[in-house]
Amino acid sequence: MSKLVLASASPRRRELLARLGLPFTIQPSRIDESVYRHLPPAARVEALALAKARAVAAGLTDALVLGADTLVVCEGRVLGKPDSPAAAARMLAFLSGRTHTVYTGVAVVQAPRGPEGVTHARTAVTFRHLTPDQIEAYVATGEPLDKAGAYGIQGRGALLVAGIEGDYFNVVGLPLVQVEELLAIFGVDVWGRV
């Protein structure tokens, strides 16, 4: 099997990929994400995941590079990572009592310029009605500051969620079923390594 490389600095993606039991290394990508802002959410996360994987793959040989990107969308508004505690509080107040959609694109590229595969997952998440005190307390934990949509469902942010429809791991940042399916296309048997 070619060496597997995760093109992400996300600790959540690292933890999720490790669950598959495959050895991998990490090499974060450096791309200009702003050039994809005009695309609709599903196309955007796929394009960004592919761009991240390609950027890392270009400098490698004999490696499979996995890229991913996640967006949160509510009522047509894309919510990225908040740039301050105040921005996080505004996002959480906006999401309160609403259902939003989490999109994660996943791409695999055979380095350096080989075959590519890309797909995405989509999950609906409904937030509880949050009080200003709950929002303030959650923001004070610091947890929302490095996450799209200003919450982490795998942490204390779970208390904000009334329910989800779809893949939980997609909301965390890496839809494992799609990852397994893409890796299988490239000859990686996740089940044979469990």
Curated annotation (Swiss-Prot):
The active site is at D69 (proton acceptor). It is found in: Cytoplasm. It catalyses: dTTP + H2O = dTMP + diphosphate + H(+); UTP + H2O = UMP + diphosphate + H(+). Keywords: Cytoplasm, Hydrolase, Nucleotide metabolism. One of its GO terms (cellular component) is cytoplasm. Pfam families: Maf. GO terms for molecular function: dTTP diphosphatase activity; UTP diphosphatase activity. The keyword RNA-binding does not apply. One of its GO terms (biological process) is nucleotide metabolic process. Its EC number is 3.6.1.9. Its main location: cytoplasm. SUPFAM superfamilies: ITPase-like. Belongs to the Maf family. YhdE subfamily. NCBIfam families: maf. This is dTTP/UTP pyrophosphatase. It comes from Moorella thermoacetica (strain ATCC 39073 / JCM 9320).
